Amino acid sequence: LDGPWYYREGFSPANVTGAPSWVRAAVTLDAGWQLFNYPDQPPLTGKAPFVWLTTVIPAKNYQSPILFFTTTEQSFRVYLDTTMIYRYGSLTPQRFSYGSAWHMLPLPSWCGGHRLTFEMYSTYPHRLGQFDRMALDESDAQLTRLLKEDIPYLTALPVNIVMFIFLLVYVLKRRIRDRLYVFVMLFFLLFSVWLVGTS
């Protein structure tokens, strides 16, 4: 999705049906929308926790397109033209942070040439309106991309588990009471949990 991208900062008023009026305004691209250089963050004032981003999906023939992207500390809704097709989290303050999350959003095969709009919310101004990465491709290509990005984690996990088991057997067999071995085993255990969480 290499553009052009437009943004609009703030909370959208509702129309007569209760839907955000800026969804339809994104389709017609009225005067309230401003161009920005994607993938950079839009130049926001920081006065509102909401931003709207919109672009047109490239006009291609798709079979089973999937939009893959990652976000950090943001909740959002995604609209295809004027229809909401995906939502993540609540667009209100939450007790706990959303952290970093990746999303695989299936799109209809006829999505080429249609407008894609994001309504984004965050209490972290430096994160609002920013994607860590984004790609639109066929489903098999997206799964291949995801596996390639996770190969370092997938290979490190079994090695880490084997090292933990070898060290545990060594300590139990020799009845070693040195705290250093306990700390090293704890490191391997926590590192394994981290690897599972990031993959």
Where is each model-derived feature located?
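Short, aromatic-rich amphipathic segments at membrane interfaces
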Residues: 130-153
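Alpha-helical transmembrane segments of multi-pass integral membrane proteins
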Residues: 124-138, 192-199
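Sequence/structural signature of beta-propeller blade repeats across diverse families
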Residues: 20, 36-46, 86-96, 101, ...
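Beta-strand-rich ligand-recognition modules
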Residues: 80-115, 120-131
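Aromatic-lined ligand-binding clefts that engage carbohydrates, nucleic acids, or primary amines
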Residues: 57-80, 116-118
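Hydrophobic alpha-helical transmembrane segments of multi-pass membrane proteins
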Residues: 154-172, 179-199
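Extracellular and analogous surface-interaction loops
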Residues: 52-65, 105-112
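Extended carbohydrate-recognition surfaces in non-catalytic/accessory domains of CAZymes
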Residues: 1-61
